[in-house]
């Protein structure tokens, strides 16, 4: 029970890596604000069962990361609970794959809006609240695409590169409040997006990885638990 009596916020936790982090944190005793874009019957049932099994509180918070006002609304909902926030995991994001010369500007802007700008906005609001407690941990889910230039990943990779750089800068600023800020950069991971990838592209990514296999969501979740 590494997170017993702690409260975490996890964004984009209805599937894939985010869902694995939600389950791992709940299994380790954390109460969770589970932030997703919209309510679905399946997600509501999943968190009800998980909460019942683990005995922790899981509070859904619904907002669209593209809409600035909704992001502010999500922050307000969480802060109004008056709970101390110990951990924030920024996992919400979208994938995008297209060659540089074929990438329209609106696509690039949309990817950055969700993968970068909304993450910054959310971190600003939550970190101000964390600062009052003089403690906390922020974990950003980035990607190896933000570290290694790969054909067809200009939009996605550059948004994750920006998030990685921001993580370093924010860490240097929030350290005085005893808030740690880290990023995890997984390689290709077995999620629904992985299943939708072109087989040739998927195999190329697997071949470039050290273990010659996709990463499992729970492996990323365990790293997030360590950093929490």
Model-derived features with residue positions:
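Conserved glycine-rich cofactor-binding loop
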Residues: 7, 14-15
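Substrate-binding pocket helix/loop in short-chain dehydrogenase/reductase
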Residues: 99-100, 107-112, 194, 205
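Alpha-helical segment proximal to the catalytic Tyr-Lys
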Residues: 128, 172-176
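Residue(s) in the substrate-gating loop at a strand-loop-helix junction
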Residues: 143
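C-terminal helical subdomain
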Residues: 183, 205-228
């Amino acid at each position: 029970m590494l997170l017993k009596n702690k409260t975490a916020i996890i964004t984009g936790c209805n599937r894939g890596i985010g869902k694995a982090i939600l389950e791992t944190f709940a299994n380790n005793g954390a109460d969770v604000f589970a932030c997703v874009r919209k309510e679905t019957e399946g997600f509501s049932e999943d968190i009800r069962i998980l909460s019942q099994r683990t005995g922790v509180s899981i509070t859904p918070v619904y907002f669209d990361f593209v809409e600035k006002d909704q992001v502010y609304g999500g922050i307000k909902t969480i802060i109004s609970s008056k709970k101390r926030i110990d951990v924030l995991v920024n996992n919400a994001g979208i994938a995008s794959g297209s060659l540089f010369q074929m990438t329209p500007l609106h696509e690039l802007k949309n990817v950055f809006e969700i993968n970068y700008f909304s993450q910054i906005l959310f971190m600003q609001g939550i970190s101000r609240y964390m600062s009052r407690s003089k403690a906390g941990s922020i974990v950003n889910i980035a990607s190896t695409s933000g570290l290694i230039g790969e054909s067809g990943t200009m939009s996605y990779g550059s948004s994750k590169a920006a998030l990685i750089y921001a993580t370093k800068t924010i860490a240097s600023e929030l350290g005085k409040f005893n808030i740690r800020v880290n990023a995890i950069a997984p390689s290709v991971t077995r999620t629904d997006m992985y299943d939708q990838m072109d087989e040739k592209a998927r195999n190329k990514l697997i071949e470039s990885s050290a273990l010659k296999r996709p990463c499992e969501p729970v492996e990323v979740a365990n790293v997030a638990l360590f950093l929490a």
